[in-house]
Amino acid sequence: MAQTLYDKLWNTHVVHTEDDGTALLYIDRQLLHEVTSPQAFEGLNVAHRPVWRISANLAVSDHNVPTTDRSHGIADPVSKLQVDTLDANCDAFGITQFKMNDVRQGIVHIIGPEQGATLPGMTIVCGDSHTSTHGAFGALAHGIGTSEVEHVLATQTLLQKKSKNMLVKVEGALPRGCTAKDIVLAIIGRIGTAGGTGYAIEFGGSTIRALTMEGRMTVCNMAIEAGARAGMVAVDDTTIDYLKGRPFVPTGAEWDQAVEYWREFKSDEGAQFDRVVELNAAEIVPQVTWGTSPEMVTSIDGRVPDPEREKDPVKRDAMERALAYMALEPNTPMESIKVDKIFIGSCTNARIEDIRAAAYVVKKLNRRIASNVRLAMVVPGSGLVKAQAEREGLDKVFTDAGFEWREPGCSMCLAMNADRLDPGERCASTSNRNFEGRQGAGGRTHLVSPAMAAAAAIEGHFVDIRQLG
């Protein structure tokens, strides 16, 4: 019987299934960070339990680490406690960890793939919503809660119910100026933030296959914003080429065996999906969110929608509340919206490809950031991304234009440390969530691609990067 990619991943990891469909799944890799792991380790200590499979875990501090000068440590006592606690727990249990001043440190969903700890055919979990990122490698990856983090540490298994299968198929050549971020925002705009609820989404089609691994990770990263449990892309040569030679990846004869196995992780011809959504890439244009949910998105050449045109009273009310929070008027051209701050970073868009795309725009415009922009910051996703960008001279492109070049971490994505918006400030952000207060109490977030964020920094307002040539 033909199987989907999700079926294969599920079936190869089921240990036991109850009559009600609840299954015990084996977990191949758990990624840990400082925010959702302390209580899990404390649970092990109280119960005098060991970590079941130490080598299956990889840890890093990312949420609370400062992105400015780290020579003086962490100023906030709560943040410092969480980071120090992760250090102590990993030392005590023998878990591999990239500590704050390790060049390999970075955002957990960037360092996993970067190190080759994320591999095709794996089940991967982390106490973080955007674990779906790792599905780009043909893996089943999703976020879990702290009690589940403890359960995986203790047993290397997890209780789950199987999701339904959804295929999001994007065909055609992506227009100039459009990126993976625009693809996934367009998908969410189409199906809504509840469109994927109860599903695992496979992203397929010629447009997805043409993306780099960085682009595929961006798309899978935001599967959770469409309501899906997980997002994934089938394994192909692009996947294999990315992985070869990375630290955690098999070598020699084991590499050859692994590649042969990995290539099985694609949907069989004739496999049945519970829902299929199709998009034409030629119709995608650079996207900008206007509201307080990722589904509140439109094209850069569009206007802020008018709630009066929405027939559904519930949606109309949500639109009105969003516009009030965002201080926007219906029918305002998106290109006329001015911004106060720029954030280029996060587990969605802080890889080397993203940094290059933003730097290209800054270099092309050849001007400093606009006078109304109070802060424009670039936060690389890892120490290795930062080092690569500096070898290419990208840091100087940014600093010469008035941007701040920071140390790796989650940063303004969720208003950590001093990296936040003040009340009423408007931000062009390459992150994944534009909820009320997400980047700081009273802050207003617009989600865009790195190129769009860079252009907004220079111009002081959103612009259509397709016009830059």
Curated annotation (Swiss-Prot):
Catalyzes the isomerization between 2-isopropylmalate and 3-isopropylmalate, via the formation of 2-isopropylmaleate. The keyword Iron-sulfur applies. PANTHER family: 3-ISOPROPYLMALATE DEHYDRATASE, HOMOACONITASE, MITOCHONDRIAL-RELATED. It comes from Burkholderia ambifaria (strain MC40-6). Belongs to the aconitase/IPM isomerase family. LeuC type 1 subfamily. Heterodimer of LeuC and LeuD. Keywords: 4Fe-4S, Amino-acid biosynthesis, Branched-chain amino acid biosynthesis, Iron, Iron-sulfur, Leucine biosynthesis, Lyase, Metal-binding. The gene is leuC. CDD domains: IPMI. GO terms for biological process: L-leucine biosynthetic process. It is an enzyme of class 4 (lyase). This is 3-isopropylmalate dehydratase large subunit.
